[in-house]
């Protein structure tokens, strides 16, 4: 699957990143090769092969999911430089509100 320079530029703009034309072309080529390799892997016959999630022989240890009392909201907001009705206000980072 060919990734175009326009697609790379579009995603870069959404991420607020800027690349030169040479970098954009290189990313498009590299990403196209990666997608092609993933598509090729999808064609491999894995019939009879057990699913593998890790090569390490370890078990995940999880703590019990127990609800605990949180920090008192008023106490927490004493350290907040700017707030509005218990919402923490932070500086805007998107010029026009973004595409999100």
Swiss-Prot record:
Q: Which Pfam families match?
A: GatC
Q: Which SUPFAM superfamilies match?
A: Glu-tRNAGln amidotransferase C subunit
Q: Which reaction does it catalyse?
A: L-glutamyl-tRNA(Gln) + L-glutamine + ATP + H2O = L-glutaminyl-tRNA(Gln) + L-glutamate + ADP + phosphate + H(+); L-aspartyl-tRNA(Asn) + L-glutamine + ATP + H2O = L-asparaginyl-tRNA(Asn) + L-glutamate + ADP + phosphate + 2 H(+)
Could you list this entry's UniProt keywords, alphabetically sorted: ATP-binding, Ligase, Nucleotide-binding, Protein biosynthesis
Q: Top-level EC class, please?
A: ligase
Record-level GO BP terms: glutaminyl-tRNAGln biosynthesis via transamidation; regulation of translational fidelity; translation
Which GO MF terms does the UniProt record name?
asparaginyl-tRNA synthase (glutamine-hydrolyzing) activity; ATP binding; glutaminyl-tRNA synthase (glutamine-hydrolyzing) activity
Is this entry keyworded Transmembrane helix?
no
Q: What is its EC number?
A: 6.3.5.-
* Similarity-based family: Belongs to the GatC family.
> Subunit structure, per the record?
Heterotrimer of A, B and C subunits.
Biological function: Allows the formation of correctly charged Asn-tRNA(Asn) or Gln-tRNA(Gln) through the transamidation of misacylated Asp-tRNA(Asn) or Glu-tRNA(Gln) in organisms which lack either or both of asparaginyl-tRNA or glutaminyl-tRNA synthetases. The reaction takes place in the presence of glutamine and ATP through an activated phospho-Asp-tRNA(Asn) or phospho-Glu-tRNA(Gln).
**PANTHER family of this UniProt entry?**
GLUTAMYL-TRNA(GLN) AMIDOTRANSFERASE SUBUNIT C, MITOCHONDRIAL
Name of this protein: Glutamyl-tRNA(Gln) amidotransferase subunit C
Which species does the entry assign this protein to? Streptococcus pneumoniae (strain ATCC BAA-255 / R6)
